[in-house]
UniProtKB/Swiss-Prot annotation:
Keywords: Amino-acid biosynthesis, Arginine biosynthesis, Cytoplasm, Lyase. GO terms for molecular function: argininosuccinate lyase activity. Its EC number is 4.3.2.1. GO terms for biological process: arginine biosynthetic process via ornithine; L-arginine biosynthetic process. This is Argininosuccinate lyase. Belongs to the lyase 1 family. Argininosuccinate lyase subfamily.
Length: 441
């Protein structure tokens, strides 16, 4: 069955028919196409375009189609053709009435919005699960000291929990972005027709409410040609993957023998086909790698849309693969990341030792001098020279004796050793959001 053809004298070429078909991709939208068709039939009944009896036939047939299983994907043009073809096979000419006051243009946009809305809720749930795991880990490793880094060089002492909670903030923003995007996803375009609306008295608001949409689109041309909601989702997904990738990069580094801060479980690691000793952090590496794939999907759709005149163009058929692939990739990465973190072990002692040998208390020594009345820039220079001296002696700053300190600055007294204590440094942090020692209450 074709949904078009009366105007044509010649049969479509076989290669063109295959080229034009999207059923292998958009079959995923089948349940949404059926639900949207049910709501559309309700709208046709309300407008007295079909009778109560005809509606009941259509409803019964659509619900039967929803329960059917396919051993292989039918050879039809697209998911809309499939549903209408099966409907006609079941109830004859009554089934042909389903497309009254509707175009595939508003139909596909509706299906995609319903699909994406559903998937966004699933992704939000996964992000919330991830944040629960991160918060639990931060409680477990509260006050476990580690180096904080800038330029991948040891910078200042922080706690492992504070580092984990940095990612909680990122994922909270991601959740907020997804929730906000639902305002633009959850808009019904049914009734926009091909591009100009319809002369049938369809109650668009009523049909939208049946499908759980919050509002209807206000311009029929925009309704069928808009794919901003997909581009926006792909942008948000790219940000989420960026956050996962940054964390994955750290886990790859931390799990190396050079760092040895963490060890991934056997469940989330793989081995080498040639080197028997290897334990590779492939879970983190694959997440890092798949980030580029999601970025590519965003760029793909942006490129597809950038030159399209209004309204619908067949180019827009290419929106589904980047959308579906991004949804699948993002969900599996989140699931694997959650499992990886849950089973990861942390080498607290190794982190603590890394703080000791890195002069991470140098900034606090400079602040100590400022409190003694020395301008910060001068204090910075004095401490820099002290660090250089300690490096030549191959000792931490806090192991210098007081006379050595006074060789660089007479303002340094015995209380400097309290200031240089890492735990005291963490306790001294006062600003909101600082990496500080958490006292037990």
């Amino acid at each position: 069955m074709k949904l078009w053809g009366g105007r044509f004298k010649e049969k479509i070429a076989e290669d063109m028919e295959i080229f034009n078909s999207s059923i292998n991709v958009d079959i995923r939208l089948l349940p949404y196409d059926i639900e949207a068709s049910l709501a559309h039939a309700e709208g046709l009944k309300k407008a007295k375009i079909i009778s109560e009896e005809e509606f009941e036939q259509i409803e019964r047939a659509l619900r039967e189609i929803k329960e059917e299983k396919f051993e292989e994907i039918p050879k039809v043009e697209d998911v809309h053709t499939l549903v209408e073809q099966m409907l006609v096979e079941k109830i004859g000419d009554v089934g042909k009435k389903i497309h009254t006051a509707r175009s595939r243009n508003d139909q596909i946009a509706t299906d995609e919005r319903m699909y994406l809305r559903n998937e966004i809720f699933k992704i939000i749930d996964l992000l919330e699960q991830l944040n629960v795991v991160l918060v639990e880990l931060s409680k477990k490793y509260k006050n476990k000291i580690m180096p904080g880094y800038t330029h991948m060089q040891r910078a200042q002492p922080i706690t492992f929990s504070h580092h984990l909670l940095a990612y909680v903030e990122m994922f909270k923003r991601d959740i907020d972005r997804l929730k906000d995007s639902l305002k633009r996803v959850n808009v019904s375009v049914l009734g926009s027709g091909a591009l100009a609306g319809t002369s049938y008295d369809i109650d668009r608001t009523y049909v939208a409410s049946l499908l759980g949409f919050n509002e209807v689109s206000l311009n029929s041309i925009d309704g069928v040609s808009d794919r901003d909601f997909i581009v926006e989702f792909l942008s948000i997904a790219s940000l989420i993957m960026m956050h996962l990738s940054r964390f994955s990069e750290e886990i790859v580094l931390w799990s190396s023998q050079e760092f040895n801060f963490v060890e991934l479980s056997d469940e989330y690691s793989t081995g080498s086909s040639i080197m028997p000793q290897k334990k590779n952090p492939d879970s983190a590496e694959l997440i890092r790698g798949k980030t580029g794939r999601v970025y590519g999907n965003l760029l793909s759709l942006l490129t597809t849309m950038k030159g399209l005149p209004l309204a619908y163009n067949k180019d827009m058929q290419e929106d589904k693969e980047p959308l579906f692939d991004t949804v699948d990739t993002l969900k599996v990465c989140l699931k694997v990341f959650i499992g990886m973190l849950k089973t990861m072990s942390v080498n607290e002692e190794k982190m603590k030792q890394a703080v000791k040998f890195g002069y991470l208390n140098a900034t606090d020594l400079a602040d100590y001098l400022v409190k003694k009345g020395i301008p910060f820039r001068n204090a910075h220079d004095i401490v820099g020279k002290l660090v250089a001296y300690a490096i030549t002696k191959k000792v931490p700053i806090e192991e210098l004796n007081i006379s050595e300190f006074k060789n660089f600055c007479q303002s340094i007294d015995e209380d400097v050793y309290e200031v240089l204590n890492i735990k005291n440094i963490l306790k001294s942090r006062k600003t909101i959001g600082a990496a500080r020692w958490e006292e037990d209450v």
